[in-house]
Amino acid sequence: MYIPVKKLAFMATLIAIALAIFTIEAQIPVPIPIPGVKLGLANAVTLFALFFKSGKERDVEKLTVANVFMILICRIVLGAMFTGRVVSFMYSIAGGILGFSAQVLMKQFVSHKQIWAVGAVGAIFHNIGQIAVAIFLTGAPVIAVYLPILIIVGIFTGIITGLAAQFSIKRLEEIS
């Protein structure tokens, strides 16, 4: 698959930003004592990539869903390697793919003023994917008891990441 150099450089920049955010966030202790809870701020970069209207007018070709998916997968794989949390890779990849799929589907029905909602839905499905992996790996369906708590926290954190992406896009469009 051929990717033009400018587009590839833009994707690499987004991966680097997401990795930096992910790595910094991994070092910050979470104030909520619930296993699996974190802000997931690196997802703001995924949302940004999914919604940003790059294009010929900005001298970068528009990112396709496949391009954004590549950014997500690179961030998850490299993030697991950089932080040394390889065990969490399976949780992240399952949650990331499920959350991304939900975000791609929802993108068709929202405007740029509702990216926060896409962030919330993505976080919910991310948590569902992680719980499914936990149940599969442990054989303990009782783990699903965490799901309502993770969904509530996920809505909150998803709104935050969605708003971060939404405001970033708005600001970049204003200065372009």
Question: What do the PLM-derived regions correspond to, one by one?
Answer:
Residues P4-K7, G55-V65, R85, S111-W116, ...:
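Membrane-helix interface segments
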Residues A9, T13, K62, N67, ...:
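Short helix-perturbing small/polar motifs within transmembrane alpha-helices
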Residues K53, K62-V65, F69, V77, ...:
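A short hydrophobic/aromatic micro-motif that marks alpha-helical segments and, especially, helix-coil
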